[in-house]
Amino acid sequence: MNMIDFEYDGIKLSSLKMSISSFSDPDDEQELGNNLELVNVKGQFADSYFSAGYSYTEPYQLEFYTTKYNCDNYDDFVISDAELNTLIRWLNRKSYCKFKPIYNDGSFADVYYMAYFNMSLLKAGGDIVGLRLTLNCNAPFGYQETKVFNGTLGSSPLTIEDVSDEIGHLYCKTTITVKSAGNLTIQNSADKYNAVIIKNCKENEIITMSGDTKIITTSMDSHKKLPNDFNFNYIRLVNTFSSRTNTFTANLPCEIKMEYNPIRKVGLVI
């Protein structure tokens, strides 16, 4: 499995007649990222430590090379000024854009990273023949393309298997269409102490919430006190090392749509 191409902000490297190149030993070890650092605490009279927390030491970063590849003319390997300008404008942005690796065996086709590039030039005989690219990600890991789940709660549960590589919880973007007025409670079997409670719901009211942004909205102007009626427990998916199952139930009939991006710790293989 090797990365032979990539897509950045919807444009493929190969569409610009460039290819991924390697100037290192093909058996070199490559980092996967995901480097953790535990916060260790030891009692005054104890000999062993226990973990009181953790943090990732740095976002994921990878360096690789790209050179020109023109299958119509193998002697056309020099990058012109115009081609260089196009590459710089495309890759060297002031914001994180979607980066998708493309592997020769089709592996991890639904995995992406949010990243920007730094670059330096490779010269031979005074000509620019390649670029050294440094991929800088916004996190120590990648993401899987958005997964969407739909269900009708109240009459039947909605069961979701959290496929994230990260043990813990991930918030979802959730849209709830309430079919009967009342005080709504949504419970997750894997998150028993984080029940979602929204009081004074109206019939056919559409409530949208995002745990990442901590924003909740309603389709009805008459529910002006929604922030006061909400307990600020946002819907999330939970997984442990032994279980990934999340079963959602509700006390009122409602349609629910949940969207999330699982964390993937697969790294990049050049």
What are these model-derived regions, one by one?
Residues Y143-I270:
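Intrinsically disordered, low-complexity segments enriched in serine, threonine, and glycine
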Residues M1-M3, L91-C97, K179-A181:
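A short, compositionally biased
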Residues V41, D47-F77, D127-F141, N246:
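Oligomerization/assembly interface segments of phage tail-like spikes and tubes
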Residues E58-N104:
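Long, hydrophobic/aromatic-enriched structural stretches that serve as scaffold segments
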Residues L13-S19, A109-Y116, N194-C201:
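Short amphipathic beta-strand/extended segments with alternating polar/hydrophobic composition
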Residues M1-N40:
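Polar/acidic, low-complexity leader/linker segments enriched in S/T/G and N/D
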Residues Y54-Y60, L91-R93, G125-V129, E166-L170, ...:
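Solvent-exposed loop and beta-edge segments used for protein-protein assembly and interaction
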Residues Y96-P140:
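Short beta-strand and beta-hairpin "edge-sheet" elements
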